[in-house]
């Protein structure tokens, strides 16, 4: 199996996996979505809320506000199923504001300087003149399989590597290139060919194939000039996070989690403990 990183930023990574199987790639995708630990606000104590927003809606917004959750930040915090949270192993947030103003995520005061909202400009609630807000909240580590707020990924998808072939026995069809909605194809009448600009951007929608078939049928032909398929064992994988942790860290933790599950299954099949 070969892996090639095509691009990487603070919140997105795109890489190619060659010589792999669909179940394996899909297992990594699922682990990245629901089995990587992340911290999010879970318990909210609203002592005063004079705004027009319902308490439940405000608590929901707080829970979905992404918090810095890299391994350095959440190290030492109990995972789900461990001991109950206490003052010395939990992260407390407080929010005390008075209108008129828009309360943003940056106004949340954390008991741990390493764990704070990823973005400062997420609007939480609007307070009018004289309205007050007083909240205390507890952030806990959890998994995406329990609630979406603990999912580190906003996008976690893969597709099989596209393959575009041309039927040289059929006359060249320049119009099929214009049918591509992503501009993957470009017709070059000077060199009498259709060029593939970026095959990895191909969505395999086959708009070009349908256009070529229509043109062929209008000329009394049976075959399409262009065909779109895919490599069964090559994949383009894309992970985008909400900023709570780097995408590469999400991928590594997902692989570790998958490896641990495989080890447990091996021990069980050999008659050992679960």
UniProtKB/Swiss-Prot annotation:
Cofactor-binding details, from the entry: Binds 1 [3Fe-4S] cluster.
Known EC number: 2.7.7.6
Cofactor(s) recorded in Swiss-Prot or TrEMBL: [3Fe-4S] cluster
Keyword set, alphabetical order: 3Fe-4S, Cytoplasm, DNA-directed RNA polymerase, Iron, Iron-sulfur, Metal-binding, Nucleotidyltransferase, Transcription, Transferase
Residue numbers binding [3Fe-4S] cluster: 202, 205, 208
Entry annotated with the keyword Cell inner membrane: no
GO terms under biological process: DNA-templated transcription
Enzyme class: transferase
Compartment(s) of residence: Cytoplasm
An example Gene Ontology molecular-function term: metal ion binding
Pfam families linked to this entry: RNA_pol_A_bac, RNA_pol_L
Record keyword Transferase present: yes
Cited Gene3D superfamilies: 3.30.70.3110, DNA-directed RNA polymerase, insert domain (2.170.120.12), RNA polymerase, RBP11-like subunit (3.30.1360.10)
Main location per the UniProt record: cytoplasm
Purpose of the protein: DNA-dependent RNA polymerase (RNAP) catalyzes the transcription of DNA into RNA using the four ribonucleoside triphosphates as substrates.
Quaternary structure note: Part of the RNA polymerase complex.
Family per record: Belongs to the archaeal Rpo3/eukaryotic RPB3 RNA polymerase subunit family.
Name assigned to this protein: DNA-directed RNA polymerase subunit Rpo3
